[in-house]
Every structure is written in structure tokens, then in C-alpha cells.
Amino acid sequence: RPILTDSGGFQVFSLTGTGRKITEEGVTFRSHIDGSKHLFTPENVMDIQRQIGADIVMAFDECPPGTSDYNYARHSLGLTQRWLERCVARFDETAPLYGYEQNLFPIVQGCTYRDLRKKAAEHAVSLNRAGYAIGGLAVGEPAEEMYAMIEVVNRISVSYTHLTLPTT
């Protein structure tokens, strides 16, 4: 059975009140259990998912609230795309640990702004990965906006033919 692991981007979104700090380096937060400090970076998140042995590994991303203003959403998308480049570099320089293929999926962010979603989708599909995920939806935006963003992303993705199926 295939295993998919999440990078923790959505979990970071839910860490309000834990001293969460989002920077270019990654995300620092305190454990809600014992107060210990932790740092997630694109690189160590890739390493963790490699160690888990997931078949599908999600890129590390920031999941901004659905109600984010345009400037914050644009800044967040820029950060997510820079983190994605670091995820791809780390993933591609490491090998699976358990003798089977693992796949890194970019996550398409952009809140409910069509131009940001379009930019994110174009970037994601340009990386020639086996798939991608649509992130940052169902986080406070109205349902009709969520469906509109899915449509924006799907229009981009179906115009590319980068899906490669493994052969046996």
C-alpha cells in the first residue's frame, strides 16, 4: 500500500500560540507537549520523509490562512516556491533508503488569488514531478472560491504532459 507523508506545512498553520516563527530558513516552534524548541527546514523535512519511507513525499510549504490579503499571499507563495527549490535539491541529492522509488510532489499555494495560483501551478508542473498537490484550501475561504482555485490549477495541469508512470 502506498504511503503519503505531509511535510508539516498545514500543521505549522495550526501551531498558532506555540511561538511559531516563519523565516526563510524554515519554521521554528515550541512543542505543545513539553515546550521544546524545534526547527523544520525544507532539507530536514525531506530527510524525515525519506526516513519514513513514504512513496509520496510532500514539499515543505507555508499554508497561509484563506483570508490572507494579496500582499501576504504573494510573499507566502514566494517563500513556498523558494522552499520548494530547496526541497527538490535535497530530495534529488539523496537516495531512497529502502530500495523502492519515492516521489516528491510540489504543493500549489496562492490562497484565492487566481494569478498566484496560476503562477504556482505553472512552477509546480515545470518541475517534471510525477504529481503535485493543491494546498491551502479549506482553510477559511468560501467553498465557491475553493472550487474556483481548483479549476485554475486544473486548467494549467492538463495542458502539460509531464506525468511519467514507473515501468516494471
Provide a role label for each language-model segment:
Residues R1, A54-D55, Y100-L104, N128-A130, ...:
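Short, well-ordered coil/turn segments that N-cap beta-strands
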Residues R1-L97:
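Non-catalytic, usually N-terminal nucleic-acid engagement modules in DNA/RNA processing proteins
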Residues I3-D6, V57-A59, L104-V108, Y132-I134, ...:
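Hydrophobic faces of well-ordered beta-strands that scaffold small-molecule active sites
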Residues G8-F10, E62, I107-Y113, L137-V139:
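Active-site beta-loop-alpha junctions enriched in small/polar residues
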Residues N44-D47, H75-R82, R86-A89, D115, ...:
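Alpha-helical scaffolding segments of alpha/beta enzyme cores, especially the outer helices
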Residues S68-A73, G140-I150:
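Active-site-adjacent beta->alpha loops and helix N-cap segments on the catalytic face
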Residues R86-N103, C111-L137:
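Alpha/beta enzyme core
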Residues T161-T167:
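Conserved small/polar residues in nucleotide/adenosyl-binding loops
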